[in-house]
Amino acid sequence: MTISSTEQEAKKVNVVVDRNPVSTSFEKWGQPGHFSRTLAKGPKTTTWIWNLHADAHDFDSHTSSLEDISRKIFSAHFGQLSIIFLWISGMHFHGARFSNYSAWLSNPTTVKPSAQVVWPIVGQEILNGDVGGGFQGVQVTSGFFQIWRAEGITSEVELYWCAVAGLLMSGLMIFAGWFHYHKAAPKLEWFQNAESMLNHHLSGLLGLGCLSWAGHQIHVGLPINKLLDAGVAPQEIPLPHEFLMNRDLMAQLYPSFNKGLIPFFSLNWSEYSDFLTFKGGLNPVTGGLWLSDTAHHHLALAVLFIVAGHMYRTNWGIGHSMKEILEAHKGPFTGEGHKGLYEILITSWHSQLAINLAMMGSLSIIVAHHMYAMPAYPFIATDYPTQLSIFTHHMWIGGFCICGAAAHAGIFMVRDYNPAQNYNNLLDRVIRHRDAIISHLNWICIFLGFHSFGLYIHNDTMRALGRTQDMFSDTAIQLKPVFAQWVQNIHTIAPGNTTPNALATASYAFGGDVISVGNKVAMMPISLGTADFMVHHIHAFTIHVTVLILLKGVLFSRNSRLIPDKANLGFRFPCDGPGRGGTCQSSAWDSVFLGLFWMYNCISVVIFHFSWKMQSDVWGTVQNDGTVTHITGGNFAQSSITINGWLRDFLWAEASQVIQSYGSALSAYGLIFLGAHFIWAFSLMFLFSGRGYWQELIESIVWAHNKLHFAPAIQPRALSITQGRAVGLAHYLLGGIGTTWAFFLARIISVG
């Protein structure tokens, strides 16, 4: 049923709830598998425990009521928030109880951040290294110290208060999750009111969120950081509430505070330019962005988002209607355009989740790149272990979110997509063009793979033959990234025209000066050459292959020439039944499974490239005469142009710290390096095995048990094909990420 414009204006926001819809029953929750009739009967075979884990959070399988599913998801979100608050509370508690935060705050260039002390059990206190400031502990690389400094936290007592607040919020969230499922559960129409949700999320979460951060920075963060930058001891700085209550105190640091709100209401906003700045570049004392620039930035964002949160039509009959916008969105070659998408988005939470995961994943990757190019917090740029850790962290998070987007897009296509409601709209047209899309993607993957890898093979061969003049390199056959160099140059000279009042470029990665703090490079121009051109094409290759696998899984998730009735088989199925050989591993789930391996390949190349490039061309020490000595002495340009160079000069050379870490404070990384290799190798046992082999093995073991009259009541079963692949994938990724983590940190803590 379509709703006309006049009817839509009458779609009022009505907060409607059902009172006491579900009783609170610990007895019910105590029964494993209570959400499924089959599982509730208890285990007959060992498959039961696997199905219990697989289906516990698959709310679609518990009920067909969209309202009940929506309530469960809503309630689960509060549980997630509770865990996040508990984690944040724990981080602040560690900072308050087990850290050298005060020592670091007084001397952030030589004291290393530590907020973890290992108990002395059988010699484990060796892990507590001397991090400076008379403190023995484990060096941490989360960036929390730098965030606390930017917030204006000057003592451990304040961290205790933050920890207590986190605990209280955690408890409140658990209560809210229970309350909104068991006591006052929203009706389906509340969940489906897209306009109201957009208004509240844009204005409330993003708008007021930015405004509160800007307000905190202006009233607390800026004055405290200004005093810290000037060398005032933390214990002598007034407490945050004194800056809030005492305008004279603020006016000593920022004179415009004397004028109060008069410049605001008289539109004379430039009066506030002493604390809302547009300087550009980095603060030379801290090596981080100017906090007055970031306060200005968040204030501007707050205005934009609060305005954006008034754009959608709810009770007042003015503003946009999402349905109208989507249905009007069509061009001469796009058929019905976005008709039908509104109905999809308010009835399929998998479709919403897929879009949100793709967006958040991409955003996380963008954040990873901004955090080194424009370091946001004081002294984070010269803390190389933290810089490497947060880059790697945001890259992995982005990769996982994007793969999750493909997973939920596949689930949407199988469970929620209705072909009858999507005739000739853009989604239908993409599905009908899928052969062209996938075959083109396949062609570009082959092209990129052969050409990018081929450049390396050529270079390896030429170097082995001693024909260095025939190699692709900056000193022989040049393949300069001319477009990237042009972009860098534009960004270096643009601020002079676009922002004439800015003091410096947006990021020194594009060009400009070397910014050093405590004789360490915080940021400097990143020169690009043949080596970067080559590895960027490897990035293009691995990204396109990942997209090919994931997109193929989504577009062919309902049917294919091989299996026309895929939609009936579900999101994950091992094969198309007996007697149809060659149909295994073709479900949408299997595409996500394969896509995750390529995501791992892809992100690994990115973080290896970043780690080596920064050590070679950016990070290092600055002598008094201004000369820069890089950690690996600029070897990236000549070594990374061969496969052998990556193996010998990056992986092998930089693994020496983790391999030789035994007997030092870094020895845990040596053990993790070893253990994670084992976890990775263990995964291969699941990935390369046949199910029948294990089933036969189990049956002979059961025979032996029967012979001795202690056969188990629950019948043992081999893992299904899908379960085995899931276990293999989990250990492959866990082992790979653990290995990389230990390799990176042992290296960079030693040399950084």
Swiss-Prot record:
List positions binding phylloquinone.
694
The record ties this protein, via SUPFAM superfamilies, to: Photosystem I subunits PsaA/PsaB (SSF81558)
UniProt membrane topology term:
Multi-pass membrane protein
- How does the cofactor attach, per the note? P700 is a chlorophyll a/chlorophyll a' dimer, A0 is one or more chlorophyll a, A1 is one or both phylloquinones and FX is a shared 4Fe-4S iron-sulfur center.
Summarize where chlorophyll a' binds, as residue positions: 677
Q: Where are the transmembrane segments?
A: 73-96, 159-182, 198-222, 294-312, 349-372, 388-414, 436-458, 533-551, 591-612, 666-688, 726-746
- What keywords appear on the UniProt entry? 4Fe-4S, Chlorophyll, Chloroplast, Chromophore, Electron transport, Iron, Iron-sulfur, Magnesium, Membrane, Metal-binding, Oxidoreductase, Photosynthesis, Photosystem I, Plastid, Thylakoid, Transmembrane, Transmembrane helix, Transport
A single GO BP term for this record reads: photosynthesis
Record-listed E.C. numbers: 1.97.1.12
Major location category of this protein: plastid
Q: Which NCBIfam families match?
A: psaA
Q: What is this protein called?
A: Photosystem I P700 chlorophyll a apoprotein A1
